[in-house]
Amino acid sequence: THTDSSAASDVYKRQITGVIILFLLNTKGIIRELPPLTMPNTGNMGLPICLFAYGSQGLGVSAAISALIILCHFTLGVFLADRKFSLDVILKSPPFYAIIISVFLLYYDLELPGFVENTTFLLMYATIFLILMSLGIALTRLKVFSLNKAIFSSIGRVIIGPIIGYFLILYFNLEGFAAGVLLIQCSMPSAVLNYLVASIYSPKKIVDSVASTIVVSTLMSFITVPIVVFFALKYFN
């Protein structure tokens, strides 16, 4: 129909626009600095905060978002850092297989044995404390090299991020705890995993910039995240 053709044409235009933007950013050398802006810390910080805000139901949604972001780290993140795509990185990534198994179980509505499910839940809650400890250890090893640039990038991450999340909620017509979790996850600071990927695939100048953004955005999130959580609990509960 005419409507379907118009929708398909709109999708193609957006794809072409995205490719052009990536090409221009690549020629300017900015593309390697995008991961800290586009990939928040939905694991180390996002999971515990969503658990605190919405309980186990919020943890489930936040875990799904975190799994998607982790997959992006080993696909889009590597592509942006290295300027080329590598299938080997995905195949060597444990989260990739964990996501496949999860999707398989959900699609066929399969139930795990009771002892497996109970063990998984115990490990899940224990992991919450471990990832918070690992975040603290990782941050002590990072330093700020360019404060002005880091502040600018961090504002884009912790302030522009939740604004984009709010527009996503409106676009997908989300409500309740699902909308709140998405908003909270979008407000998280830059993920430490950005630094690990950059240290492997990017030059030292970019690595220093990524490290600075992670530290500054995490410090700024101590102020911004409580505000976002308050807003989420008030309007999406």
Model-based region annotation:
Residues T1-Y12:
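Single conserved hydrophobic/aromatic residue that forms the stacking wall/gate
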Residues S5-S6, I49-V61, L110-G114, F167-A179, ...:
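Helix-coil boundary and interhelical linker segments in multi-pass alpha-helical membrane proteins
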Residues K13-T17, P35-C50, V61-L80, P94, ...:
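Membrane-embedded alpha-helical segments of transport systems
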Residues T17, I21-N26, C72, L76, ...:
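Alpha-helical membrane-inserting segments
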Residues G18-I31, F74-S86, L135-F145, N194-Y201:
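C-terminal ends of transmembrane helices
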Residues T27-T42, Q57-I65, F115, L147-S154, ...:
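The feature identifies polytopic integral membrane transport proteins across all domains of life
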Residues A64-A67, L71-T75, K92-F104, A126-L135:
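Hydrophobic mid-bilayer segments of alpha-helices in multi-pass membrane transport proteins
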Residues I101-L168:
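Transmembrane helical segments that form the transport core of multi-pass membrane transport proteins
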